[in-house]
Amino acid sequence: MKRKKKEEEEEKLIVTREFAKRWRDLSGQNHWKGMLQPLDQDLREYIIHYGEMAQAGYDTFNINTESQFAGASIYSRKDFFAKVGLEIAHPYTKYKVTKFIYATSDIHVPESFLLFPISREGWSKESNWMGYVAVTDDQGTALLGRRDIVVSWRGSVQPLEWVEDFEFGLVNAIKIFGERNDQVQIHQGWYSIYMSQDERSPFTKTNARDQVLREVGRLLEKYKDEEVSITICGHSLGAALATLSATDIVANGYNRPKSRPDKSCPVTAFVFASPRVGDSDFRKLFSGLEDIRVLRTRNLPDVIPIYPPIGYSEVGDEFPIDTRKSPYMKSPGNLATFHCLEGYLHGVAGTQGTNKADLFRLDVERAIGLVNKSVDGLKDECMVPGKWRVLKNKGMAQQDDGSWELVDHEIDDNEDLDF
């Protein structure tokens, strides 16, 4: 009975949307012209769809430094989306995670970027879980109108700490974009996480870039006879990596199957709270590419999107929201509530515009309690505890002999899965 009711609810949600018919427009074929102000209803839910896939990176990331698995994924790829709450009432999240992404850095970066366990027995002293690659199953492909390959980059744990503490230098990106674009410069932190490798770690013997390109290439080859899209998503640090990754894929032709170099697929990045990525030459390179679109959702009171302030250029199309208009959120807000991804998705769900006269109205059925997942941003009358997302008993589980142990990691060999 419950399963039948669930299926009926999903069917009801599906018939109100036209993702399959409109996916090219929703993915920015025409740079979202006429779709942002006022916000197209299908696009509203489409943005939330990919925002939730970025949020999954936070929900599975182990931030407990007392755990030997700090910096790893709590969940394995099997049933991944069910475990992060994206199965029930999420009819379009019909994806399978095919690969986990790991990263390291050959320069010092803040703990909010890479987090390591205190224990000497920690799973890794060099690498962090940095995201995943997923692809629609056959049902998801039918619902979304094409085979969708998703690359989701994890964001920073405590992003506000690095605004003042991190040196925002630019470095040459010739190793990514080649001698043709030897003037392009990228933020040193984003570049290091994207390009660094460490032979000591089994997780980052190849850098994050090559891990992604290999898996995307494998999936493109597998589905070369189908209509395919590549969608990349991320928040904060993850947004910067998503922008860099999307540009890399298109600039170097990695959006084409090796056996079908004549067949390119569109690449769209949905990024939230994105800091700036590169200089004016990076923007020039980006602007000259045909198959790429980036939609930057920006909460107006959030300070992160204006960093770094000097020497950088923004790319893509901006979609402004203002969560200060929400009648559910505390006023005044603070840096954390303005920046958190769940706050952003709440803003997307209710935005009617950012002008003074524009109101806020939730046009999708999205629980307001999600805002408080990692912050304390809702008004007290909403009756939702702040920072409520924690593992049951903080991961402590009773064993058969009556003892208690920290169980906060599912083993995953990360070998290629063929769904």
UniProtKB/Swiss-Prot annotation:
**InterPro entries tied to this protein:** AB_hydrolase_fold (IPR029058), Fungal_lipase-type (IPR002921), PLA (IPR033556)
EC nos:
3.1.1.-
The entry's note on the tissues where this protein occurs is: Expressed in seedlings, stems and siliques, and, to a lower extent, in flowers.
An example of a Gene Ontology cellular component annotation for this protein is: cytoplasm
Q: Which residues cross the membrane?
A: none
**Which enzyme class?**
hydrolase
Query: A single GO BP annotation from the record?
Result: monoacylglycerol catabolic process
The annotated consequence of gene deletion is:
Mildly fast-growing seedlings regardless of the presence of an exogenous carbon source, accompanied by a better beta-oxidation and mobilization of seed storage oils.
So what does this one do?
Acylhydrolase that catalyzes the hydrolysis of 1,3-diacylglycerol (1,3-DAG) and 1-monoacylglycerol (1-MAG) at the sn-1 position. High activity toward 1,3-DAG and 1-MAG, but low activity toward 1,2-diacylglycerol (1,2-DAG) and 1-lysophosphatidylcholine (1-LPC), and no activity toward phosphatidylcholine (PC), monogalactosyldiacylglycerol (MGDG), digalactosyldiacylglycerol (DGDG), triacylglycerol (TAG) and 2-monoacylglycerol (2-MAG). May be involved in the negative regulation of seedling establishment by inhibiting the breakdown, beta-oxidation and mobilization of seed storage oils.
The identity of this protein, by name, is: Phospholipase A1-IIgamma
Q: What is the lineage of its organism?
A: Eukaryota, Viridiplantae, Streptophyta, Embryophyta, Tracheophyta
